[in-house]
Amino acid sequence: KRLLEDLGIKINEIIPEGASVKNLINLPKAWFNIVPYREVGLMTASFLQKDFGMPYILTTPMGIIDTADFIRQVQKNVNKLAPFFLNKTFDYESYIDYQTKFV
C-alpha cells in the first residue's frame, strides 16, 4: 500500500483483505490490477482482463530489481489512461533512482 501511495496511486479495492460481496461491484472501476501472489487473485485478474480489458501486474515488489520492475509496470499501466483522464503522464524513474541510490 505504501509504495502505491508514494507514487500517488489511489487504491480502489484490496481483495480479499476486509472485502465483502458489496466491494466486488467496484472491481471494474480499476485501471489495472496487482496480483502480488499468484496463488491468490490470478484467476480474478485473468477474468477481469478477459471480460473488462483490465490489465494486471504479476511482479511482486520484493527486492531492488523486482520493485523497480513493478514500478515501471505500474507507470506503463497508469500512462495508458492518465493522458485521457488526468491530462498528463507519469515518470517514476526519479523515485526508483532515489529509492535504490543508497542500497
Curated annotation (Swiss-Prot):
Question: Catalysed reaction per UniProt?
Answer: chlorophyllide a + oxidized 2[4Fe-4S]-[ferredoxin] + 2 ADP + 2 phosphate = protochlorophyllide a + reduced 2[4Fe-4S]-[ferredoxin] + 2 ATP + 2 H2O
Which GO biological-process labels does this protein carry?
Answer: light-independent chlorophyll biosynthetic process; photosynthesis
The family line of this record is: Belongs to the ChlB/BchB/BchZ family.
Q: What does this protein do?
A: Component of the dark-operative protochlorophyllide reductase (DPOR) that uses Mg-ATP and reduced ferredoxin to reduce ring D of protochlorophyllide (Pchlide) to form chlorophyllide a (Chlide). This reaction is light-independent. The NB-protein (ChlN-ChlB) is the catalytic component of the complex.
Cell compartment(s), UniProt = Plastid, Chloroplast
- Broad EC category: oxidoreductase
Whom does it interact with, and what assembly results? Protochlorophyllide reductase is composed of three subunits; ChlL, ChlN and ChlB. Forms a heterotetramer of two ChlB and two ChlN subunits.
What does the note accompanying the cofactor annotation read? Binds 1 [4Fe-4S] cluster per heterodimer. The cluster is bound at the heterodimer interface by residues from both subunits.
Which superkingdom? Eukaryota
Main location (coarse class) = plastid
* Pathway(s) served: Porphyrin-containing compound metabolism; chlorophyll biosynthesis (light-independent)
Q: What is its EC number?
A: 1.3.7.7
Classification via InterPro entries:
ChlB/BchB/BchZ, Nase/OxRdtase_comp1
Q: Which cofactor does it need?
A: [4Fe-4S] cluster
Q: Which PANTHER family match?
A: LIGHT-INDEPENDENT PROTOCHLOROPHYLLIDE REDUCTASE SUBUNIT B (PTHR33712:SF7)
The name on file for this protein is Light-independent protochlorophyllide reductase subunit B
Q: Name one GO molecular function term.
A: metal ion binding
